[in-house]
Amino acid sequence: MDAESILHMLDVESAAEHRTDGWWVDVPDLDVRGLATLMRTREVRFVTLTGTPDTAGGYRLIYHWDADGALLNIATTVSAGCIASIADIWPAADWVERELRDYYALVFEGRAETPTLMLLEGDEPGLFSRTSAAGREIDPAVTARDAAEAERKES
């Protein structure tokens, strides 16, 4: 199914912007499970999910889909640190949900478990949240364990 038809079904085509790299739309309060189910039934392929902190203290999540060769990017905002999981509908979302949990301590509701992906077992989720508070000069890949230990000692 083509991207424009999907946007029409979501009733967001008027807010969507077509760019050289695909269709982009922001959907506040997105029902991600409803979206994932619609995409599954319409045979639109899940590509990935990206997440970044937003300026209001929440997170911006972008669900990327391949609709007959056109990239469809549907963004939403998470303010409370949790959002519904789509991994049971789209197993390919499993790793990226685990990655976002490790990096930002996001909770994906509905998962039976969320094992670590980038962190070691027993490490606290939220690697980027912790290290960004310590300053930009810290390399999270190298010093995450040291930053977490220093934070524990200060508490």
Region annotations inferred by a language model:
Residues 1-155:
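Terminal low-complexity/charged segments
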